[in-house]
A protein has these predicted regions:
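PP2C/PPM-type serine/threonine phosphatase catalytic domain
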Residues: 1-125
Length: 125
């Protein structure tokens, strides 16, 4: 992907930033823990790490593998909550984007938005 930059700000409402992201040559993911719930920062960190690991070990990246990566992360979060009851209710959003050939593929869960910046114009996908 060309010209990818990651930046996260805490904003004006929350005391803690629960955003996490990773950027590789052809894959990007952003997660945002559910603020106001216990473990939002843990969920977002866990999710982005699991998505990254899953996709980096997947031989073929396509729409199905992006969805599978999010489902895999969700399963890992659910399993962790089962082991640590204090984390009950934790959750996160996720947006995953991959460049495959000349196409951008994406998958998301939750209310995080995806935008494309092209020709000096920002458009929500």
């Amino acid at each position: 992907m060309n010209n990818i930059v990651g930046l996260s700000k805490i904003g004006l409402v929350r005391k803690q930033n629960e955003d996490r992201f990773f950027i590789s040559d052809n894959i990007c993911a952003v997660t945002d823990g559910m603020g106001g719930y216990r473990g939002g920062e843990i969920a977002s960190t866990y999710a982005v790490d699991e998505i990254k690991e899953y996709l980096q070990s997947t031989p073929t990246i396509n729409e199905t593998s992006l969805v599978d990566a999010i489902l895999h992360a969700n399963t890992r979060i659910v399993n962790r909550v089962a082991r640590e009851e204090r984390l009950s209710g934790m959750g996160t959003t996720a947006v995953v984007v991959a460049k495959v050939d000349d196409n951008l593929l994406w998958a998301s869960v939750g209310d995080s938005r995806l935008y494309i910046y092209r020709n000096d114009e920002l458009t929500q996908i």
